Amino acid sequence: MSEIFDAKAFLKTVTSQPGVYRMYDAGGAVIYVGKAKDLKKRLSSYFRSNLASRKTEALVAQIQHIDVTVTHTETEALLLEHNYIKLYQPRYNVLLRDDKSYPFIFLSGDTHPRLAMHRGAKHAKGEYFGPFPNGYAVRETLALLQKIFPVRQCENSVYRNRSRPCLQYQIGRCLGPCVAGLVGEEEYAQQVEYVRLFLSGKDDQVLTQLIARMEKASQDLAFEEAARIRDQIQAVRRVTEKQFVSNAGDDLDVIGVAFDAGMACVHVLFIRQGKVLGSRSYFPKVPGGTELGEVVETFVGQFYLQGSQMRTLPGEILLDFNLSDKTLLADSLSELAGRRIHVQTKPRGDRARYLKLARTNAATALITKLSQQSTITQRLTALAAVLKLPAIKRMECFDISHTMGEQTVASCVVFDANGPLRAEYRRYNIAGITPGDDYAAMNQVLRRRYGKAIEESKIPDVILIDGGKGQLAQAKAVFAELDVPWDKHHPLLLGVAKGADRKAGLETLFFEPEGEGFSLPPDSPALHVIQHIRDESHDHAIGGHRKKRAKVKNTSTLETIEGVGPKRRQMLLKYMGGLQGLRNASVEEIAKVPGISQGLAEKIFWSLKH
């Protein structure tokens, strides 16, 4: 039995300086991370007789040990707190599940600049515009830009090795700088400048310059050129008319909040140069009994301080909630950015409109999320009743994908009480089996997945095996042989056989490989959740298989050539713009690739020809 935490003795050792504290339970897990301007005062508040909330009572009841880290300043404490939250993911902290870097539009610094989507560190020479809320918003913007300003979007490896213009040139979406004589340097540079101005929010300058060029072309009797520029002007106007724009050229993030039924939605609008680049809804994990103020404060800190390496900070942040540590947050962000960042909670004018828009979006997204959660909860409850289980908190499903036995991939998808847990989806490359042996593939993936220690919270209540009796028999055999520290008898193994003509609604379920199967009515909520997880698993497996097949297709020919290892293969494919470009290259062109000698170039050339 663990010892009772002696709060009085501990508090005697605590300093009154700023710092961060970590609370541990009896199992040694960090259950809460907090910061304080005065550590002694803050930590003493946890051990009073009248605690502020049930959440705090539950937290204090589990404390077995507290670690304290003293910092020089409050700002240091704030940064360290969020680093610890990201590292330990404590269950009593509000957690933001968002580790993705945000995409930007990249305009390269090449002689003939190209447009592309970019994520991650900004090492490449060029200009970055954004951030955008997701990849879809970037791809949509790039497609739009390509229609208005025909600047190239191809990779440099493709650009360097073209002798004839590509389809994009033929349909008027690229000026073809890859082929000499198709476009003048001045004309291409002019289109690049239009892109730069457009992405910087200077639409009026773009229109002014285009109108002047159209009038000049008309005066010079170059009517075809004037008509082309007229079409460009109309396209720019159509785009700018649709945008929600502020005349102030605002550069800010707007954060709206909605909170209901223990769930929070934080909606962020990304506004750059007065244009709404897009928005995104976040649903942080909120422990029971948490106040809205703590949700907002923790979210904002994690959103900017944990993701600071990949996130471009705006000049101003508008908040739908008055933070107690607003000044501290602004100072910390300013220190991080190397410039002044303003945090505002009571805006007026256009900014108030932005905040209202963010608030409305947060409320709408929360209603949708609660509705979806209600549906998945009803379906899981129905399935638990069918399977005679008290509840289903976690469910995993497996599927196998291959083409004629080649490039076999197994997928595992995970659902919890709220639906798909995509961060925990996994793919497994299957090797060392007879091609096309799905039973052996299932046997292998289950051993790899479950033949090791598993956290108690991650032991599934139900394991779905897509494939029916044969696959279920493999699963039963694997689990019978497992020698693991967790309860291998806890998961219920359930086989799912596809119906006649593989139609949805005709699935047969099996508890035992040799037993009789049973079906559920097509309108059964329990069947719907089975179909949902089965389809997720199928799509995840096919996606992995296609990636593996494409990779093999591009590299298998080169793998047979002696002297061409992974690095040289990568260099050849990158420099030549793919396998087809390499097949069409001469010996002299291949020899120009870094690391390829004349002799090796000849070997590669003749190997590809035969």
Swiss-Prot record:
Family: Belongs to the UvrC family.
Function: The UvrABC repair system catalyzes the recognition and processing of DNA lesions. UvrC both incises the 5' and 3' sides of the lesion. The N-terminal half is responsible for the 3' incision and the C-terminal half is responsible for the 5' incision.
GO MF, one annotated term: DNA binding
InterPro entries: GIY-YIG_endonuc, GIY-YIG_endonuc_sf, GIY-YIG_UvrC_Cho, Hlx-hairpin-Hlx_DNA-bd_motif, RuvA_2-like, UVR_dom, UVR_dom_sf, UvrABC_protein_C
Keyword Cytoplasm carried by entry: yes
The protein, known as: UvrABC system protein C
Subcellular location: Cytoplasm
Organism: Salmonella heidelberg (strain SL476)
GO biological process, one term: SOS response
Keywords associated with the record: Cytoplasm, DNA damage, DNA excision, DNA repair, Excision nuclease, SOS response
